[in-house]
């Protein structure tokens, strides 16, 4: 799998391209700006770009209106297809944000329910009770994601919903030639849905990468042969953040040894987790590419802006074993000197 030895560059398109925070309905091809960065991203050593939400939404991107259309604030499907083509020409894979747990109140099927209530053919696409009311006085109650009622939870046990999502993924492959998906709040997704998604993506006949957003807990529940290829390793991200900002080097040592140490009992031997390394502000135009930055070795965890990020995939395999051992040795020495242990 190509992703197992990749460095990912994350772009939050709405912020990166300077789009309005609220969808104003105007079609502006701002997404084409990303093509200007392709050479710079490649020279950083990144060979994949992960795009945060790109599709039509009410505001921040995670409140989707339509999975089939690029957000008008960013341009059209043709504009984004041109960007993907440029990235591929520079040897950069494209991964999109799959926000399948919830949609926005402006989602086309939810608007049909608002209008037709019981008579809507899409009422079972969501978790709805018509004997209640919502915070927005819709005349029915619905489940929002973790109490955020601007984000309407999809019913992923409904075959029609699953089929719609799969049809959209196939469309993305055909129009944009994407190479994978990052699943938003994967810890909330029905595991049967994840299995179906993996089977569908495997059937596409390509090395299609699936990585899930997981915070804490047992990553093995979601990563495996019939599940996701990888997940976000927030445990190590927290350790990296603490090591650089609080000089707490014990935490990252503990996390690395717990996850990928030499003992047989370590949690994720043989698995590949996506580690968040750095967050940066993005200038209006690409910086000079004369001296490539060492993105692979950057361990800076400052919290600035979600315009762009860098990730590396780590695994308990030969290619990464040396770097893991080196990191833990360094952390042990520094922790010992600082008296933290």
Show where each model-derived region lies.
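N-terminal structural segment of carbohydrate-active enzymes
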Residues: 1-93, 101-103, 108-112, 147-148, ...
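Active-site-proximal helices and loops of the catalytic beta/alpha 8
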Residues: 114, 174, 184-267, 292, ...
């Amino acid at each position: 799998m190509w992703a197992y030895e990749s460095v990912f560059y994350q772009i939050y398109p709405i912020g990166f391209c300077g789009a309005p925070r609220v969808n104003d309905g105007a079609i502006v091809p701002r997404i084409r700006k990303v093509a200007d960065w392709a050479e710079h991203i490649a020279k950083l050593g990144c060979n994949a770009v992960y795009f945060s939400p790109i599709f039509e939404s009410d505001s921040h991107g995670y409140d989707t209106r339509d999975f089939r259309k690029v957000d008008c604030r960013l341009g059209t499907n043709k504009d984004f297809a041109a960007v993907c083509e440029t990235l591929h020409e520079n040897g950069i894979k494209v991964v999109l944000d799959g926000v399948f747990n919830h949609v926005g109140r402006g989602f086309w099927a939810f608007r049909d329910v608002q209008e037709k209530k019981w008579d809507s053919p899409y009422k079972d696409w969501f978790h709805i009770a018509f004997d209640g009311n919502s915070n927005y006085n819709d005349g029915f109650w619905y489940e929002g994601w973790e109490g955020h009622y601007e984000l309407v939870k999809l019913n992923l046990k409904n075959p029609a919903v699953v089929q719609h999502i799969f049809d959209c993924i196939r469309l993305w492959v055909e129009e944009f030639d994407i190479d994978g998906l990052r699943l938003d709040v994967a810890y909330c997704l029905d595991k049967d849905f994840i299995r179906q998604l993996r089977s569908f993506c495997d059937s596409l006949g390509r090395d299609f990468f699936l990585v899930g957003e997981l915070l804490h807990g047992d990553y093995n529940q979601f990563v495996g042969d019939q599940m996701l290829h990888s997940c976000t390793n927030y445990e190590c991200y927290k350790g990296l953040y603490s090591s650089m900002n609080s000089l707490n080097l014990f935490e990252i040592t503990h996390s690395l040894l717990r996850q990928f140490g030499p003992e047989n009992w370590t949690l994720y031997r043989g698995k590949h987790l996506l580690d968040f390394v750095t967050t940066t502000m993005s200038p209006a135009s690409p910086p000079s590419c004369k001296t490539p930055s060492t993105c692979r070795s950057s361990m800076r965890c400052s919290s600035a802006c979600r315009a762009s990020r860098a990730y590396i995939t780590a695994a308990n395999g030969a290619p990464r074993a040396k770097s893991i051992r080196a990191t833990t040795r360094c952390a042990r020495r520094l922790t010992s000197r600082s008296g933290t242990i």
